[in-house]
Amino acid sequence: MLAQAQQKLAALDPPPLLLCQSMPQLRLLDSVDAAICCLDSINYLTRPRDVQRTFNRLHDTIAPGGSLVFDVHAVSKMEKLDGEVLLDEREDVFCLWRTRYRKNVKMLDYEVDLFRLQPDGAWERDFEEHHQRAYTVEELTAWLEEAGFTAIRTHGELKLRRANERDGRIYFSCIRK
């Protein structure tokens, strides 16, 4: 994925730095002015301590006055997904997605079966299993403050307004002290 992204971004000057690292162990050679963490990547950190370490590493990586932007699935969205079975069927692709939310540990587990039609007419199956943890706005805000971020704001799903309970995805923006 990073190789494809790098090809598409190669014409930019300077080209953006794309990394594949464990977030809690993030290491850069130089500081950056901003960091963006998208597609609910924080939810994939299933241990609260790993989220805290990630925020600390980002604080150490972002220059003073720099920005951090990230998104998470709202707790309410993850709870609503419990027991859902979702289907997407097209001429050459069939996708089956099954979910389970374990409220006692705030974990969303989902399995994805993806079938792709091959040139010879056979269907090729890929299987993925994902685990995400739900975090409240209050938890994430406290951990950002502890790491040294200020001006912490939440934004609604694709709207420049404060996040509310109806938002399935919550965007955070903050500034490194």
Regions inferred by a protein language model and the residue ranges of each:
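Conserved SAM-binding strand-loop segment of SAM-dependent methyltransferases
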Residues: 11-28
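A short glycine-rich, Lys/Arg-flanked "PGG" loop and its adjoining helix->strand segment in the class I
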Residues: 50-67
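SAM-dependent methyltransferase
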Residues: 69-142
